[in-house]
Amino acid sequence: MEKNEDEMRLPSFNEYLSGLCADRGEVPERIIKRANIERSFGHQLFKGTKNPSRDTVLQLAFGFEADVDAAQELLKHAGMSALYPRVKRDAAITYCLHNRFTIVETQNVLHDMKLPLIGGGKRSERCESSR
């Protein structure tokens, strides 16, 4: 019984992130940079000393250059709700993941659609210049 519990247990979120990095031959620094996450906060996520918000998990999905399925797995391992196509913002993010947009390109799509940006206030150059 105890053996089955160990096999069924999901790894902690930071263990999952580290495993993804190892599987992909990536270093956390590159993921954090591509995700447009502040460096020290990103390292705290990878160490497990900070817990991510749903938006931070989505940023990490873009950092990993994840497809929709991989992004859903990240959300699941973080204990967050999945992307839901009937929610306009989630549908836009799903579209961007499916089409391999970067985080900056995705922020521009969300901005153009007048939807909340991923991560709250981090606006891309294009978004900044359109103010």
Predicted regions and their residues:
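The alpha-helix within a helix-turn-helix
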Residues: 21, 32, 61
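Helix-turn-helix/homeodomain-like alpha-helical modules used for DNA recognition
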Residues: 78-131
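A short, Lys/Arg-rich alpha-helix, primarily the initiator
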Residues: 1-29, 106-123, 130-131
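Conserved hydrophobic/aromatic packing and binding residues within compact polymer-binding modules
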Residues: 17, 31-32, 42-45
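Key DNA-contact positions within bacterial/archaeal DNA-binding proteins
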Residues: 29, 40, 69
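Short C-terminal boundary/hinge segments that cap the last helix of small helical domains
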Residues: 66-82
